[in-house]
Amino acid sequence: MALERTFSIIKPDATRRNLTGKINAKFEEAGLRIVAQKRIHMTKEQAGVFYGVHAERPFYDELCEFMSSAPVVVQVLEGENAIAKNREVMGATNPADAAPGTIRAEFAESVGENSVHGSDAPETAAVEIAYFFSGIELVG
């Protein structure tokens, strides 16, 4: 088992409904520590850079609009196998396929408005964390 850090976003659909505390509780119950967190309102341009890997996908513009439509909570989670653990706690991208008790099964409104984002690999976690946080903000 390896101590890892991963990146998470609580998306606009969840912040609009005041679900930040409930979602954070799910992370903590799973053994993940929140070592950095801030509430921000991304611009469409910031969302575009962050999701640049999807620029050629048909949902890209809609995703950038959504992610800049209201505040989000960006955070760094730390724990044993944090990337896999976070993905397990989040559940499948499509809430209809998400296991009971996962964040998306409980809180997501649709595939597009699925409440949370999480890194999928150590390399992407490092890039995503660095996009929003400086080293001094990571308090573990």
From Swiss-Prot:
Keywords associated with the record: ATP-binding, Cytoplasm, Kinase, Magnesium, Metal-binding, Nucleotide metabolism, Nucleotide-binding, Phosphoprotein, Transferase
Q: Its catalytic activity?
A: a 2'-deoxyribonucleoside 5'-diphosphate + ATP = a 2'-deoxyribonucleoside 5'-triphosphate + ADP; a ribonucleoside 5'-diphosphate + ATP = a ribonucleoside 5'-triphosphate + ADP
Q: Does the keyword Transferase apply?
A: yes
Names of the cofactor(s): Mg(2+)
Q: Superkingdom of this entry's organism? A: Bacteria
Q: What is its main location?
A: cytoplasm
Active-site positions on this chain: H117
Q: GO BP, one example? A: CTP biosynthetic process
Q: Which Pfam families match?
A: NDK
Q: What does the entry list as the binding residues for ATP?
A: K11, F59, R87, T93, R104, N114
Coiled-coil stretches, from where to where? Answer: none
A GO-annotated cellular component: cytoplasm
- Intracellular or extracellular location(s): Cytoplasm
A Gene Ontology molecular-function term? nucleoside diphosphate kinase activity
EC number(s) reported in the record: 2.7.4.6
Q: Which Gene3D superfamilies match?
A: Nucleoside diphosphate kinase-like domain
Q: How does it assemble?
A: Homotetramer.
Q: Which family does it belong to?
A: Belongs to the NDK family.
What does the function comment of this entry state? Major role in the synthesis of nucleoside triphosphates other than ATP. The ATP gamma phosphate is transferred to the NDP beta phosphate via a ping-pong mechanism, using a phosphorylated active-site intermediate.
What is the protein name given in its UniProt record? Nucleoside diphosphate kinase
